[in-house]
Amino acid sequence: MKKIVVALFITGLMLSCTSVFAQGKYGADSANCIKYLSYYKEYYKQQNYKESLPSWRKAYKTCPPTASQNMLLDGSSMIRNLIENNAKNETYRKALLDTLMTLHNVRMQNYPRLV
């Protein structure tokens, strides 16, 4: 009986320790993730994509893809806007298309039901 109690105690202790090491929705650097998500979102709401894009890029690098599906959707929208505005610069346009396809792939991997 004593061995069972000790085994249950150790199991409970190990399970409680794993939750301490979990990173949560916003990843290891959650403060910066939330900050950059907030910054880009405010500019995005105003359709000020030029000001929104640098903060979005920082959010995309800092946050895990599972932090916000809207981060991926908004990024796709901003990249499409850049593609339209830079139709004459073929090299830049190809790089933007590659970025857009990467965003779509990341979204399909993390949100397969919603694609």
Language model features by range: what are they?
Residues 62, 103-110:
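Residue position in alpha-helical solenoids
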Residues 6, 20-98, 113-114:
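N-terminal leader/linker segments that initiate helical-solenoid repeat arrays
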Residues 1-7:
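N-terminal secretory signal peptides that target proteins for export/translocation
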Residues 7-16:
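Bacterial N-terminal signal peptides
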